Amino acid sequence: MIVDNSKDFDLKSFLANLTTHSGVYRMLDKHGEIIYVGKAKNLKNRVNSYFSKGAKDSKTLMMVEQIARIEITITPSDYEAYLLENNLIKQHRPKYNILFKDDKSYPYLVISRDKFPRVSFYRSKSAYKKGQCFGPYVSISSVKNTLNTIQKIFPIRQCENSYYKSRVRPCLQYQIKCCLAPCVGLVSQQQYDEQLAILKKFLAGKFSSVLEEISAKMYQASEDMEYEKAQVYRDQLVVLRKLQQQQIVDIQEDKTFDVIGIYMQDSYASIALLQIQNGDVVADRHWSIDAKGQDKTSIMHAFLSHFYLGDEIRNIWPKNIILSKVEFADITDLMNSISQKIGQAINWIIAPAADNLKWLKLAEVNARQKLNIYTSSKSQYQKRLESLKEFLELEKDIKRIECFDISHFQGEATIASCVVYTDDGEDRKSHRRYNIKDIKSGDDYAAIHQAVSRRVSSGLEADNLPDVMIIDGGKGQIHQAEAVFREYGIQDKVQLVSLGKGIERISGKEKIYKGFDDTEYTLDEHNPGFLLLRQVRDSAHDHAIKGQRKKVSANRQSSIIEEIEGVGPKRRKALMMYFGGWQELSRASVDEIAKVKGISKKLAQEIWECFH
């Protein structure tokens, strides 16, 4: 809903009565959208500066012209103002703020808050909501390798809670000594917590401390003649020492530091963050942004707030942070707020020398390389957008593209995927899938109609329809989408286009149809607009296939048992309660299956034959 605030907002009176306290201010346009969020020690002076005479960059002048309303929040201190500003920027992503988008989502190891916690990994910064986090790790493979290592050393459960709660006997992990089986009470709370405490030290990098503690426990168990217990500790030491030989070393906090390099070119900027431990780069991360009208200090200020005052999770925070040269006085308050949040003093190094200078130069080289890749990719993508706009004869620039594709398995488990591309590229977080229901087997036309109808309905309600909607298919598919567009009256709001391989089904020779136009179009296979259509279409196809495979896999697992006469819902539930999952059931013998309440030897034989 559009709300014009400019008519009832008295800017002159508002500025005259502003408080001099610290706090956060929000600039809103005539639609009620937040276009900028800032913080200030003195709200009156800071906000008034936007409207006073004096030199301002073009970006600020453009923003001021759009301000229809200003809202403020007073905070108890400058520190709280920084935190609130950071949270509001992440929540609303105002178009005039410097926005950072990490080039990937890093995985974290998480120890849950359950009575008998599990260790798992999450590829999200929201992982901290699940329990105590360790990381981030540089890749999925590195975190999986760590999980495998943990399983060999520490018998802590890794299973899902649903599986854990359904157990009535130990699973295979207990039998191979990779779990203590807390699910069936084979370990005391104290014993489990002891292993958990050692694991936490291990994940925090306290390698020497872990070795010493396990050695002490092994000798103590031996003296107490608890030889089985001593053997467990001995086995842990064997694996740990093997890891030590592979140069896994203790992390020394005083040799742990971050290096932040910035490189700027034209209206773009790139930031490289190197995380150093014991003289080695253990992680490198990059951010590339549009930085028109910004200088190095303002970008560094925005980045430090984004990264260190946000929800970043670190086991060990650095004692030293090395920065590209900026105006130190401008970010002193922010530095103090970061130290306050982290809970330790930080040595900020702005003009490094010797070894520290070497690290800073490395970070700046990384930032430059990343920016070259970013600008090249962005330039190519913008050319494709402009070419597609020209082909579709659109007056406005394309800000959002959505593409639909249908996938099914022999007519069943039908999935519609919708992928999203914006003027910045693929927006994976906005991708979604639709489970298609109540249609005839293999009816792609009905599936497209249902998926597009659901998307248009929700899009009108949320006011977030795309500029261009692509349908994977030919005339039949696009006609279904046209029917939906007519039903909702959006023929002039969204440009409809379809891309199909035609009779020849040759890649690069696809047939293109525009909405409400039966003309068949073809474009040169090297045409930038055509390449974008194919790029988006292929993403939708991959997204649909992945979703459909998951659905088929889930359906198959349950249908195997459903096909056996005499195994109804109650017996299926009993089997799951006893074995905890289809995989465990498939490994069980006939005699083991027959132990389940309500399952005869004959029925157990039939169940066993289903899996063999």
Swiss-Prot record:
SUPFAM superfamilies: C-terminal UvrC-binding domain of UvrB, GIY-YIG endonuclease, RuvA domain 2-like. GO terms for cellular component: cytoplasm; excinuclease repair complex. One of its GO terms (biological process) is SOS response. One of its GO terms (molecular function) is DNA binding. Transmembrane segments: none annotated. InterPro entries: GIY-YIG_endonuc, GIY-YIG_endonuc_sf, GIY-YIG_UvrC_Cho, RuvA_2-like, UVR_dom, UVR_dom_sf, UvrABC_protein_C, UvrC. It holds the Pfam family UvrC_RNaseH_dom. Its main location: cytoplasm. Residues 20-98 form the GIY-YIG domain. Keywords: Cytoplasm, DNA damage, DNA excision, DNA repair, Excision nuclease, SOS response. The keyword Cytoplasm applies. Interacts with UvrB in an incision complex. Belongs to the UvrC family. The UvrABC repair system catalyzes the recognition and processing of DNA lesions. UvrC both incises the 5' and 3' sides of the lesion. The N-terminal half is responsible for the 3' incision and the C-terminal half is responsible for the 5' incision. This is UvrABC system protein C. It comes from Francisella tularensis subsp. tularensis (strain SCHU S4 / Schu 4). The lineage of its organism: Bacteria, Pseudomonadati, Pseudomonadota, Gammaproteobacteria, Thiotrichales.
